[in-house]
């Protein structure tokens, strides 16, 4: 104990005030807020250089989840795919950034160019539908309705109506993403051969450095919201493409699917075929089975550059490749690539867990604004499904149908939502609120076709995130036998919007396994961060003024790192 006390006198701050760098000092000592925050968070004397190891007992992932400038990461701890690419530039810089509180990065011209190019590519393939005015109008009308209810109707016999009017914004956002960037995009992939901006996710176990791959692991939750055995990792795939690598002109799979759709789905709304997803998903499985030996999915990421020149850093080029590998890995998990059993449905339970870790109830009915927005954007896919839910019919996905069959369903009063005027009138409080008439005036689209009497009634099964998870899972599972090992990184000129180079790679489980281990041991704090040997990178780093690497103070650093870590472990034991 005496040895520990002596060490603390020499190596730890004598009191909290002496360890923290004040705001006035930061102006003199540090040229930026990131350095100030890092010194304050690590309780370092302002005169010291930055250590190469973490002097606290909080792992990078735990710190990232508890102290983050983005509040959403504190509410719902998670990592993005890019955060797993720890050595794409300099791991030590990434390490410092995490412990500085993950300050928000500045939006540069290069970032803006990249976002614009990605949007251009997305909209070329997926026609955008602007629903902002629809959502604004619905939200305004519903806000008025809620105020009217609360102010004038004291005895509301169905209080659930208020939740159907005004829902959870996090649930609404997730519902819009799953409906459009999973279900709609995967429908595009299987019917037209390609899709852009597709959602994928997985759960990474930082203890064993592997992605969770079993339903039992998904259901095994740890107390608290920071569970290192099940870290949510999310990504958006720039481009999926199904192709016959031996004959790129072969479109037989898609012709057969199109012929099937034209024959069996002859009902249209507007200019779109209305699809019965229950029948579609069952039939397309057969087409995939017949063509699986010839076709495969290629995973591509798009990078933008201001000039027609590749990055000079090998680590940046390698990180771009590994990013596609992570996407391919997670897509494989969601599609049941290695567990091709009829009743596994890993994606379904993974999606439910995805919502749970975000603190979202998957059985809470979607609010009216979200429901109508989903229907407006992709009525060709959801109209008949919503009719099934309204009638209490099964959708053809056993886990979802069984869950609803064995459960008392409170339903969903869409007739009450759109009949608020009548409800208020019956309560002796007349009020005019014809929502359908109001939204019909917004654009050249007939909302009466999608908000028909088949839907404007009391639904027997409420529309929920659980329903969307079920349909998402079925679409992911379509690709279990179409997953290829080809990935690519396309480099586009942000100024000319032209692709100038494509790097092709071959995905292997061994390579992604090694990358996952490297990322996991970084985030769980089991290894030291690796600093860059390319000192030109230091010119772009906020931590350069106090980092030992560019300031040539690394002599004997390996000894100091190992000794420092041992001392730190001893002090905190």
Swiss-Prot record:
It is an enzyme of class 3 (hydrolase). Pfam families: Exo5. Its main location: mitochondrion. Binds 1 [4Fe-4S] cluster. Single strand DNA specific 5' exonuclease involved in mitochondrial DNA replication and recombination. Releases dinucleotides as main products of catalysis. Has the capacity to slide across 5'double-stranded DNA or 5'RNA sequences and resumes cutting two nucleotides downstream of the double-stranded-to-single-stranded junction or RNA-to-DNA junction, respectively. Its cofactor is Mg(2+); [4Fe-4S] cluster. One of its GO terms (biological process) is interstrand cross-link repair. It comes from Scheffersomyces stipitis (strain ATCC 58785 / CBS 6054 / NBRC 10063 / NRRL Y-11545) (Yeast). Keywords: 4Fe-4S, DNA-binding, Exonuclease, Hydrolase, Iron, Iron-sulfur, Magnesium, Metal-binding, Mitochondrion, Nuclease, Transit peptide. Its EC number is 3.1.-.-. Belongs to the EXO5 family. This is Exonuclease V, mitochondrial. One of its GO terms (molecular function) is DNA binding. GO terms for cellular component: mitochondrion; nucleus. Monomer. [4Fe-4S] cluster binds at residues 90, 538, 541, 547. It is found in: Mitochondrion.
């Amino acid at each position: 104990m005496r040895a520990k006390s002596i060490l603390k006198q020499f190596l730890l701050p004598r009191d909290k005030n002496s360890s923290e760098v004040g705001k006035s000092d930061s102006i003199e000592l540090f040229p930026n807020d990131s350095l100030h925050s890092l010194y304050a968070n690590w309780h370092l004397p302002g005169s010291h250089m930055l250590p190469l190891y973490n002097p606290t007992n909080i792992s990078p992932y735990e710190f990232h989840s508890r102290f983050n400038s983005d509040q959403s990461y504190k509410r719902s701890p998670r990592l993005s795919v890019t955060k797993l690419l720890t050595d794409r530039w300099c791991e030590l810089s990434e390490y410092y950034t995490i412990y500085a509180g993950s300050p928000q990065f500045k939006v540069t011209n290069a970032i803006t160019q990249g976002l614009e190019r990605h949007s251009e590519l997305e909209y070329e393939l997926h026609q955008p539908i602007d629903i902002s005015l629809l959502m604004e109008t619905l939200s305004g009308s519903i806000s008025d309705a809620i105020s009217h209810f609360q102010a004038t109707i004291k005895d509301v016999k169905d209080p659930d109506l208020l939740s159907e009017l005004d829902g959870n914004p996090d649930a609404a956002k997730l519902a819009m993403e799953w409906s459009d960037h999973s279900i709609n995009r995967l429908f595009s992939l299987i019917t037209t051969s390609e899709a852009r901006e597709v959602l994928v996710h997985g759960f990474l176990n930082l203890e064993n450095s592997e992605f969770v791959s079993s339903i039992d692991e998904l259901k095994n939750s740890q107390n608290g919201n920071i569970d290192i055995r099940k870290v949510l990792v999310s990504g958006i795939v720039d481009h999926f493409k199904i192709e016959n690598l031996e004959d790129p002109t072969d479109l037989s799979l898609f012709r057969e699917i199109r012929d099937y759709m034209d024959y069996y789905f002859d009902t249209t709304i507007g200019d779109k075929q209305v699809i019965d997803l229950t029948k579609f998903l069952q039939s397309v499985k057969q087409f995939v089975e017949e063509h699986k030996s010839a076709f495969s999915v290629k995973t591509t990421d798009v990078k933008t550059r201001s000039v027609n020149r590749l990055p000079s850093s090998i680590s940046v080029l390698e990180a771009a490749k590994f990013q596609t590998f992570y996407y391919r890995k997670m897509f494989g998990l969601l599609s049941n690539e290695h567990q091709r059993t009829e009743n596994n449905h890993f994606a379904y339970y993974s999606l439910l867990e995805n919502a749970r870790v975000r603190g979202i109830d998957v059985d809470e009915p979607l609010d009216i604004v979200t429901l109508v927005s989903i229907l407006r954007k992709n009525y060709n896919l959801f109209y008949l499904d919503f009719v099934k839910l309204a009638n209490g019919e099964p959708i053809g996905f056993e886990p979802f149908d069984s869950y609803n069959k064995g459960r008392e369903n409170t339903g969903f009063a869409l007739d009450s939502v759109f009949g608020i005027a009548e409800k208020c009138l019956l309560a002796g409080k007349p009020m005019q609120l014809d929502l359908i008439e109001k939204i019909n005036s917004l654009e050249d689209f007939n909302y009466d076709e999608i908000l028909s009497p088949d839907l404007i009634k009391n639904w027997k099964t409420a529309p929920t995130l659980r329903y969307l998870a079920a349909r998402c899972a079925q679409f992911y599972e379509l690709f279990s036998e179409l997953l290829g090992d080809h990935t690519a990184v396309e480099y586009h000129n942000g100024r000319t919007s032209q692709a100038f180079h494509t790097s092709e790679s071959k995905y292997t489980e061994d390579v992604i396994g090694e990358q996952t281990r490297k990322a996991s041991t970084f985030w769980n704090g089991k290894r030291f961060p690796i600093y860059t040997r390319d000192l030109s990178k230091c010119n772009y780093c906020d931590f350069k003024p106090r980092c030992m690497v560019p300031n040539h103070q690394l002599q004997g650093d390996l000894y100091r790192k190992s000794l420092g870590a041992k001392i730190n472990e001893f002090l905190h034991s």
